[in-house]
Design a protein with these regions (language model features):
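Glycine-rich phosphate/pyrophosphate-binding loops
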Residues: 88-105
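Amphipathic alpha-helical segments within well-ordered protein domains
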Residues: 10, 80-83
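N-terminal intrinsically disordered, cationic/polar leader segments
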Residues: 2-50, 57-60, 103-136
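Short, charged, low-complexity patches
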Residues: 71-79, 91-94, 119
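Generic short alpha-helical segment signal, independent of protein family or function
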Residues: 30, 83-87, 99, 131
Length: 136
């Protein structure tokens, strides 16, 4: 299940003309703040780009942190989209986001299949971290 905030972002993206979609992706990339000092990030080795993630649960809400080089705006945009879903949601809602949540919304035209597999791996890594946080 795709959380409402993420679904709304995906629907907006799908409704835009193709020439505006890259602009919207860059806006999502710009929304990704640097992780706070001391947050231990895990590298997503399946990604070609150095992509580091961290998820935890505080106050019943999922918190997500990312580090993506500025030289990788499409990967950073995907991180920005991920923040629209599991971040701030209940752990259960975050765990329900399917790895291929982006399919059918036009994102396939912006990411290569190899990159999409890496980004799906990032979501799965985040979900594993949420599960671990729930059992700690």
């Amino acid at each position: 299940m795709v959380p409402p905030k993420l679904k709304q972002a995906l629907e907006l993206f799908k409704s835009l003309p193709k020439e505006l979609r890259s602009q919207v992706l860059l806006e999502y990339a710009a929304k990704v703040p640097p992780p706070p000092p001391g947050v231990e990030l895990e590298r997503v080795h399946e990604c070609q780009t150095p992509f580091f993630v961290h998820a935890d649960v505080e106050g019943g809400k999922v918190r997500l942190y990312f580090h993506v080089p500025d030289e990788a705006p499409t990967v950073k945009a995907f991180a920005g989209l991920l923040r629209e879903g599991p971040a701030g949601a209940s752990p259960e809602a975050g765990l329900e986001v399917p790895p291929g949540f982006y399919r059918g919304y036009g994102l396939e035209g912006f990411f290569t299949p190899l990159r999409l597999r890496g980004l799906e791996a990032a979501l799965l890594r985040l979900q594993a971290q949420v599960r671990k946080a729930l059992t700690s």
